[in-house]
Regions:
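Domain-level recognition of soluble alpha/beta enzyme cores
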Residues: 126-166
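Residue-level preference for the first positions of well-ordered beta-strands
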Residues: 8, 108-110, 146
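Conserved histidine-centered catalytic loops in small-molecule metabolism enzymes
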Residues: 52-73, 150-172
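Active-site-proximal alpha-helix that buttresses catalytic centers in soluble enzyme cores
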Residues: 2-88, 130-131
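Alpha-helix N-cap/helix-start capping motif
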Residues: 59-63, 115-116, 143
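A glycine-rich beta-strand to alpha-helix segment
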Residues: 106-126, 134
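Glycine-rich phosphate-binding loop signature in dinucleotide/nucleotide-binding domains
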Residues: 47-49, 102-106
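Short phosphate-binding loop-to-helix
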Residues: 86-104
Length: 172
C-alpha cells in the first residue's frame, strides 16, 4: 500500500431545524442549512477537493447536507457514497476505526457527521497545524464547517498525531 498524501475532510452537517417532539435523527435542514451546504459544495469543487468516497451519517440533516454538497460539486465523476447508521452517534474512536478501514486507493475522503465527534476527531488526529484552525476544532465546528487534514500515511495507520490540520472552512 502506498503512503502518499491523502486528504480527510470532516464536515459537520449544515444548520438544522430546532429540536422538536420527533426523534433527533429526523431533523431536517432549515433554509440556512440548504444554502450553507450548497456553498460548501461549490467551495470544495473550486478548491479541487472533490472526494472519491463520502461517509454520511444516516440522520436526515446529514443526508440532506450531502445531497446539497453533491449537487454543487460539478460535473466530474460522482463520489462513492456510504450511508452509515453508526456515524449518527459515533465517538472519536469509533470514527477513527471506520477511517482505518478505508481502501488505501482513496485519496480524498469526506465524512458528513455530527458534533462533537467531527471536531474532536480532527483534534485527536492533528499532530500539527496552524493555531487558528486548531483553536477552532478545540472550540467545535459550527454548522456546515469542515476541517481539512493531510494524512501522509495509510488510512489503516490513522492514530493520535498522524495528520496535519490545514484549515477549517465555514460558509459565509
Amino acid at each position: 500500500m502506498t503512503t502518499s498524501a491523502r486528504t480527510l475532510l470532516l464536515l459537520r452537517h449544515a444548520k438544522a431545524e430546532p429540536h422538536g417532539k420527533g426523534p433527533d435523527a429526523l431533523r431536517r435542514l432549515d433554509p440556512r442549512g440548504w444554502r450553507q451546504s450548497a456553498e460548501i459544495g461549490a467551495g470544495l469543487a473550486a478548491a479541487g477537493l472533490v472526494p472519491e468516497l463520502v461517509l454520511v451519517s444516516s440522520a436526515v440533516r446529514a443526508r440532506e447536507t450531502w445531497e446539497q454538497v453533491a449537487g454543487a460539486l460539478g460535473d466530474g465523476p460522482a463520489p462513492e457514497v456510504d450511508l452509515r447508521d453508526e456515524l449518527y452517534d459515533a465517538g472519536v474512536e469509533d470514527l477513527i476505526g471506520m477511517l482505518r478501514d478505508i481502501d488505501g486507493r482513496v485519496r480524498t475522503l469526506l465524512v458528513v457527521g455530527h458534533e462533537p465527534t467531527m471536531s474532536a476527531t480532527a483534534a485527536r488526529l492533528a499532530g500539527s497545524g496552524a493555531s487558528g484552525p486548531m483553536n477552532q476544532v478545540r472550540l467545535g465546528l459550527p454548522t456546515a464547517a469542515y476541517a481539512r487534514l493531510d494524512v501522509t500515511g495509510p488510512w489503516a495507520g490513522l492514530d493520535h498525531l498522524s495528520a496535519v490540520l490545514r484549515e477549517v472552512i465555514r460558509p459565509a
